Amino acid sequence: MAEAKHAGALGAVYEAKRPEEVAALYDGWAGTYDAEMAVAGYRHPSIALALVSRHVPRGAAPLLDAGAGTGLIGEWLGIMGYPHVEALDISQGMLDQARKKGAYKAYHCLALGGSLPFADGHFAGIVSAGVFTSGHVGVEGLPELIRICRPGGVIVLTVKNTVWEGGFADEIARLERDGVVRRAEETEPYVSMPGEVGTIPSRAVVLVRN
């Protein structure tokens, strides 16, 4: 199923081909991102937060918001009882918006898909919403998130169906067979932006690091 062509900044980031292009587009979008995504009815943050609260013990620390953007998730995690959350995003402009909310203890301007400068097992939990999607990150971003999550830690991801069916589901199945992770929960497919006509459904998945 081909995704409908989206207009404006959303369409541009979905069609981006290189990480530096994605970063520049988000830098330019950062100031109006929250308002525009509210109009689109953006659901990933609320779904991811519900799964974090269900699977990550209150007080667990540190947590990583991978693809934190403007802090739509991070600003709620502190309220929910998670005292130390760090932000990672490819766009400094988006992180600057998140910093204004005081949502995180640290801000890392980095891209998923390559090596990350964190020790093995550093984080008690990781959440990544709206990142494994068109023009952003594919299954290549998963190994490092698993590496930096401690044994027993929880990884909450949202994944667009095209990415899921393009190798992500097979990789998770392989990791389960190899005993690397356990799939604790997988949602039914849902439309992440009901205000955007033609949005391909996504799903959320919760992995526990063995």
Predicted regions and their residues:
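N-terminal auxiliary segments of SAM/dcSAM-dependent transferases
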Residues: 1-20
